[in-house]
């Protein structure tokens, strides 16, 4: 008899039980790993699968996490074969070429489209009912690409979008007002990145509109220069990349925030990238961030945001920029 047989007496043969809340992270780079650890520490799933083409790096990261299993309640698996991702509830795609210092997100695009042509069909093959969350940049275009390549309905393909931009915005407003970011309600919509749109008309604390107190807020004529906060949001990622080489922690926490709303069916409103054709005067088939309700089925509703004419014009300009790139893509 083996030690195990001496220790444990078997009562019944276990039926294989599928995971109830499996999450897959595709890509074990800095963003993938920050997303993975954020999901694990929030205890969001009973199984976390990780997949990447870089076999040694993947194996090392998975082992490193598995060595912490005692401190977690999640089974951790990893393989370069996509069968490891089978029956995932949410698949988070972080894989792709990394943005170089000074490189615009749009510049990355065709490099990443080619990577997606391999990734997306594999995800669909093993998790045909999953919710697909795209994080790789440029996120709005790649969410459109994932939607086209997957054949999924639009409510099951979501881009992480401006969830992080809005978090940065709220943090910086909080710093200026000496308040916690959760008490500063503020939204950034449109493109994740350089042409994002701050909705100054909606910024409020405890229901008090800040533009009501300072009608010049967010304009050139504002003596308090609130506009600089949006510039800091846009420049924030570039600044972090310049200082440490990449961004990871905040986007990882932002991803876990979105996964939580889906897995726990919270019906929370998040600014995420979705098909906005027909909204805010957008005519083309583009994905941009607007406030959306996330739950167990994916993106269930879109909030009709009241935008000022100038804000709406900026969203339309974003859409035109993205469509200009999208129509050149070879899918």
Swiss-Prot record:
Lineage per the UniProt record: Eukaryota, Metazoa, Chordata, Craniata, Vertebrata
Primary location group: cytoplasm
Cell compartment(s), UniProt: Cytoplasm
Binding site for NAD(+): 29-57, 98, 137
Subunit structure: Homotetramer.
Alphabetic keyword roster: Cytoplasm, NAD, Oxidoreductase
Binding annotation for substrate: 105, 137, 168, 247
Protein name in UniProt: L-lactate dehydrogenase A chain
Transmembrane spans: none
Cytoplasm is among the record's keywords: yes
Any one GO MF annotation of this record: L-lactate dehydrogenase activity
EC number of the protein: 1.1.1.27
Catalytically driven reaction(s): (S)-lactate + NAD(+) = pyruvate + NADH + H(+)
